[in-house]
């Protein structure tokens, strides 16, 4: 049975999702009352057509990271470790809360010193509602999408979800 919360394909008859531990009993599965709710529960994150993320490795200098963000007009960078696996995320919020307060020499600092390590992630085939729930619970503006190996392959922003909901309401 496919979990309506995270999209994981569980064994038939399972009472609880092996991935997210949500109940799979019919009484606990929410039912959609509107087309928007149905879309959030059934449409995959991939329907947002997430953009390819800009990535840097953990040893990139903060000066270089800031320049990339400014030149590409983006609000975040995904930070990768060896083998390309996602190690963290550097957002505008990180810059304001961590870097701006300390005002270190940016050429000498590395992104790994200021990134948010081990960020929440989703996969392109997860239900949109699951991604939205992760963003709300964790107070995120950006949600990295990863493949089965943990390598980033997309990013979804709160603006993407708002645009999707607005489009489906009209």
Model region roles, listed by residue range:
Residues 1-170:
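Tandem CBS (Cystathionine beta-synthase) repeat/Bateman regulatory domains
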């Amino acid at each position: 049975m496919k979990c309506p919360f995270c999209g994981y394909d569980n064994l038939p008859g399972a009472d609880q999702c092996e991935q997210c531990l949500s109940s799979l009993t019919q009484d606990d599965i929410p039912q959609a009352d509107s087309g928007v709710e149905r879309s959030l529960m059934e449409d995959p994150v991939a329907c947002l057509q997430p953009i390819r993320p800009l990535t840097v490795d953990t040893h990139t200098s903060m000066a270089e990271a800031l320049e990339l963000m400014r030149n590409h007009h983006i609000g975040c960078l995904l930070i990768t470790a060896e083998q390309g696996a996602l190690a963290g995320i550097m957002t505008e919020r990180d810059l304001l809360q961590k870097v701006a307060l300390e005002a270190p020499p940016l050429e000498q600092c590395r992104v790994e010193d200021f990134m948010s390590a081990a960020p929440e992630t989703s996969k392109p085939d997860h239900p949109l509602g699951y991604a939205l729930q992760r963003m709300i619970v964790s107070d995120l503006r950006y949600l990295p999408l990863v493949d089965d190996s943990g390598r980033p392959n997309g990013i979804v922003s709160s603006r993407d979800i708002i645009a999707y909901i607005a489009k489906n309401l009209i």
